[in-house]
Design a protein with these regions (language model features):
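Short amphipathic alpha-helix used as the core "switch/output" element in two-component signaling
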Residues: 60, 85-98
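Short, glycine/charged-rich "phosphate-handling" switch motifs in NTP-dependent
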Residues: 123
Length: 162
């Protein structure tokens, strides 16, 4: 995978990749971003295989103008085809993505899930809020911390041609 900027889409907005299979949760997240007036572009994929394809820039996600690398990944754990933990393991094995912040956003509060997520390299593990306003607040805090205040590792330079 080629080295690309992880910071912005074509409009200059930071990109959040939401990996979520529940259409109701996707709709709530989109509404929460709008209500919080977050200056971000949200891309959504519905399962673990689609998340890997998006991040790898393969198939329908080959155009980085339309499918830019994210500045932040919001990852559910309970996904069809490939679990969130498997996606996280794959993300951390990719040099172009190994420093991209991954926030697990899930309904699971199982100690085993929490332990595995952190062991595999999650930057944060958050339980999905029950109330809509809680989600608005949570996304606002994530935006403020990960996309505005946190200093991330700059993307690695592209390797020199031989």
């Amino acid at each position: 995978m080629e080295s690309m900027s992880h910071e912005a889409d074509m409009a200059g907005l930071p990109v959040i990749l939401l990996v979520e299979d529940n259409p109701d949760d996707v709709l709530l997240a989109r509404r929460a971003v709008k209500k919080a007036a977050l200056p971000v572009a949200m891309q959504v994929v519905e399962d673990g295989d689609e998340a890997v394809a998006y991040l790898d820039g393969s198939g329908q996600f080959g155009d980085r103008g339309r499918s830019p690398l994210p500045a932040l990944i919001l990852l559910d754990l309970k996904l069809p085809k490939r679990s969130g933990l498997e996606v996280l393991r794959w993300v951390r094995s990719q040099p172009a993505l190994d420093t991209t912040p991954v926030v697990v956003l899930t309904s699971s509060s199982e100690d085993e899930d929490i332990q595995k997520a952190y062991t595999l390299g999650a930057n944060s593990y958050l339980q999905k809020p029950v109330a809509f306003n809680g989600l608005v607040q949570l996304l606002g805090m994530l935006d403020l911390y990960w996309l505005r205040n946190n200093l991330s590792v700059p993307p690695a330079p592209a390797p020199a041609p031989h």
